[in-house]
Every structure is written in C-alpha cells, then in structure tokens.
Amino acid sequence: AVAGSGHSHGHSHEKISGEEAVKRASNAISKLSNAKKIDTSWTGIAADEVKKKTFSKGPEWVVIFKNANIKDPSKQTLYLFISLYGDILGANYTGE
C-alpha cells in the first residue's frame, strides 16, 4: 500500500485555492529575486491582492505585489500569473 501525506510532487490535478496561489507566487518572487531578474527588495513583500481573472486561454490566478522601494512607478506593481492547478505561468508589470 502507498501511504500519502496529502502532498503531491510535480503537476497537481487539483485546483489550488487563492491562498495557495499566494504561497506559490511568493516562492516564485524569491526565485526571480535570487536570479536577479527582479530587484532584491521584492523578497519578503506580502501579496497585496489575489484574484481570479479570465484570459483568452481561460481563468488564472493573478497575485499582485506592490513595492514602494522601486523608483520607477511603472515597475512598483508586479503581477504573477498562476494556473488554477498551481503552475507559474509568468510575471510582468502590466497585469495583462
């Protein structure tokens, strides 16, 4: 018999909650920051908002972070896009 702890590895076939989307987005921000793809001041910033938004390919979680430490106003809001199944789909400063 296989005993499971309720945690899956790899791709999940269950939809995640908004709370779980925030956790995954925060983890992705740490990785982006460590890889120097975004400013290190993003690390540790709590999500400002999470919402489900429908795009051309279907619904996704959008997790929004705001960082007043960034000098360029167009880059003070960072959007992370996460599939309903928990995969990181992308990140940008426009929300589109």
Task: Map each language-model feature to its residues.
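Exposed beta-strand-loop-beta-strand "reactive/processing" segments of non-cytosolic proteins
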Residues: 40-84
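Boundary of Sec targeting at the N-terminus
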Residues: 2-6
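Short, non-transmembrane alpha-helical segments in secretory-pathway proteins
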Residues: 10-52
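A short, surface-exposed interaction/processing loop segment used at functional sites
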Residues: 78-96
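Detector for Asparagine
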Residues: 27, 34, 67-69, 92
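Serine/proline-rich low-complexity intrinsically disordered segments, especially terminal tails, linkers
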Residues: 7-10, 85
